[in-house]
Design a protein with these regions (language model features):
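Membrane-interfacial amphipathic helices and adjacent loop/beta segments
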Residues: 39-40, 45-51
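Short N-terminal binding/cap micro-motifs at the start of the first secondary-structure element
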Residues: 18-23, 47
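Active-site-adjacent pocket-lining segments in enzyme domains
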Residues: 2-19, 28-42, 59-105, 109-201
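Short gly/ser/thr-rich secondary-structure transition/capping motifs
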Residues: 52-60
Length: 201
């Protein structure tokens, strides 16, 4: 479950208006699988506030984040992705990660940020709905897939209502829960009681 660089550290981007529900399945279960989760914000030590009003103090400043020190960058959605270009540095960092062969996972509003950055122009992807991304003026509409979550190489995308499918694709890319991902998904997505025994067997 280590990246090609040998690290098991997963970096979670945090910023004001972050959508709290979108990344919890992924981060909690990656931590249970042995990954270290570190938060990355605009400024290290300067709190950000989520949609729920929860304050998070980032471990690391975005400027100090290097792809070679990471197994994965997760970009949660946030209202600020639809309010201007304040979060553009995060999608620029996503480009640096992808250029370095390090995976990026983006959900909800973060997919619009990737679209504006041009990172969806030639990759299969999804989001909330196709016309949400079309409004960005991006050139990748032909690669839009109407699915819960989509993994194309090192890029994972999902819409805001699919945090479980989003997590499943992240696990698959990092090789977590081999042989148990289907049971995990059925338990948390479908509330299948039989999956509990499979997951914990």
């Amino acid at each position: 479950m280590t990246s090609e660089s040998g690290t098991t550290t997963v970096h979670l981007a945090v910023y004001d208006t972050l959508a709290d529900w979108e990344t919890g399945h992924a981060t909690a279960w990656l931590a249970r699988a042995g990954h270290t989760i570190r938060t990355v914000g605009p400024v290290a030590g300067e709190p950000v506030t989520t949609l729920a009003g929860i304050r998070i103090v980032p471990d690391l400043a975005l400027d100090d984040l290097r792809p070679e020190d990471s197994a994965l960058l997760i970009l949660p959605g946030a209202e600020k992705y639809d309010e201007g270009d304040e979060l553009a540095p995060f999608t620029a960092k996503a480009r640096a990660f992808l250029d370095a062969g390090v995976p990026v996972a983006a959900i909800c509003g973060a997919t619009a940020g990737l679209a504006r950055e041009g990172l969806l122009d030639d990759r299969r992807h999804t989001s909330a709905v196709s016309f949400y991304l079309a409004a960005t003026g991006y050139k990748g509409a032909e690669h839009y897939v109407d699915a819960d979550a989509v993994r194309d190489g090192d890029l994972i995308t999902a819409g805001p209502t699919e945090p479980v499918a989003f997590a499943r694709e992240i696990f698959a890319r990092l090789g977590a829960y081999e042989g148990k991902r289907d049971a995990w998904f059925r338990l948390f997505h479908d509330s299948d009681p039989a999956a509990f025994a499979e997951l914990n067997g």
